[in-house]
Amino acid sequence: MPAPSSPRKNQTSFDPEMLLKLVTDSLDDDQALEIATIPLAGKSSIADYMVIASGRSSRQVTAMAQKLADRIKAATGYVSKIEGLPAADWVLLDAGDIIIHLFRPEVRSFYNLERMWGFGDESDQPVSQSVLS
């Protein structure tokens, strides 16, 4: 009997950095606000990267999440798991190697995930999307 594959990893050869670029480009195309990328490799087994972004409204957050899931599936064949769409205050997409959090601005400020995952080291601070380009 074959060993079960990791549920987190996608089954394609899509590189995590290429997936990260796809995610940040998609969010930028959809006019997401304050896109932040947090490298998790070596710090957490949940993913290689966490991406956090805001939308101006629940409607924009919903649209960004759905478009992003469609783009990831088209590029990699991976079906992202999505949580939080009914209210769309905070939507989480699990894209395998990347976890994406999409917020309305006031909800993002309340939870402050960037600070929680900052780990207190200058080198561990989130990288803004403009630095990645």
Curated annotation (Swiss-Prot):
Q: Which Pfam families does the record cross-reference, listed alphabetically?
A: RsfS
* Record-level GO cellular component terms: cytoplasm
What keywords are annotated for this sequence in UniProt?
Cytoplasm, Repressor, Translation regulation
**Cellular localization per UniProt:** Cytoplasm
Q: Which GO terms describe its biological process?
A: cytosolic ribosome assembly; negative regulation of ribosome biogenesis; negative regulation of translation
Q: What are the disulphide bonds in this sequence?
A: none
In which domain of life is the source organism classified?
Answer: Bacteria
Q: Which Gene3D superfamilies match?
A: Beta Polymerase, domain 2
Give an example GO molecular function.
ribosomal large subunit binding
As for what it does, the entry says: Functions as a ribosomal silencing factor. Interacts with ribosomal protein uL14 (rplN), blocking formation of intersubunit bridge B8. Prevents association of the 30S and 50S ribosomal subunits and the formation of functional ribosomes, thus repressing translation.
* UniProt family annotation: Belongs to the Iojap/RsfS family.
Q: How does it assemble?
A: Interacts with ribosomal protein uL14 (rplN).
Name listed for the protein in its UniProt record: Ribosomal silencing factor RsfS
Q: Which organism does this record belong to?
A: Zymomonas mobilis subsp. mobilis (strain ATCC 31821 / ZM4 / CP4)
Source taxonomy lineage? Bacteria, Pseudomonadati, Pseudomonadota, Alphaproteobacteria, Sphingomonadales
